[in-house]
């Protein structure tokens, strides 16, 4: 079997790695081996965090909805329960957007959710 010389392919591969490692600090942007290690870690972090971003945004939406719901004298979990009972299908992303940008519409949704809840659930807890 003939010997395989890799000079062109190896140079191309190294050039691509160093090109994608631009902006890294110190040796990690200049030396191939360090750049490759950092690039592999970077790709791992990017993959992981693309998935984590989804749950982080959901947490943010829930926090915003809860804050706005409490201004309307209802808690987050009662609001969600009321929306289910009233058969209002609005996802958390839209609810959070309404809470921030159109508070009047959010208040109307809260009132509809309150009306759908059973009477004993709306009553405040006795101390």
Curated annotation (Swiss-Prot):
**GO biological process: what's one of them?**
ribosomal large subunit assembly
Q: Which Pfam families match?
A: Ribosomal_L20
Question: Matching SUPFAM superfamilies, A to Z?
Answer: Ribosomal protein L20
Q: Record's InterPro entries?
A: Ribosomal_bL20 (IPR005813), RIBOSOMAL_L20_CS (IPR049946), Ribosomal_protein_bL20_C (IPR035566)
Keywords associated with the record:
Ribonucleoprotein, Ribosomal protein, RNA-binding, rRNA-binding
**Which residue spans traverse the membrane?**
none
- HAMAP family named in the record: Ribosomal_bL20
Q: What is this protein called?
A: Large ribosomal subunit protein bL20
Organism equals: Corynebacterium diphtheriae (strain ATCC 700971 / NCTC 13129 / Biotype gravis)
Q: Which gene encodes it?
A: rplT
């Amino acid at each position: 079997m003939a010997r395989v010389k890799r000079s062109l392919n190896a140079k191309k591969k190294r050039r691509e790695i160093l090109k994608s490692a631009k902006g890294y600090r110190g040796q990690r942007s200049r030396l191939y081996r360090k750049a490759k290690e950092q690039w592999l870690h970077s790709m791992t972090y990017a993959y992981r965090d693309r998935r984590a971003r989804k749950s982080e945004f959901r947490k943010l939406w829930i926090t915003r909805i809860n804050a706005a719901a409490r201004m309307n004298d209802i808690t987050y979990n009662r609001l969600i329960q009321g929306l289910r009972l009233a058969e209002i299908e609005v996802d958390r992303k839209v609810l959070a957007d309404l809470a921030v940008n159109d508070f009047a519409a959010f208040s109307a949704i809260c009132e509809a959710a309150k009306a759908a809840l059973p009477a004993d659930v709306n009553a405040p807890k006795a101390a």
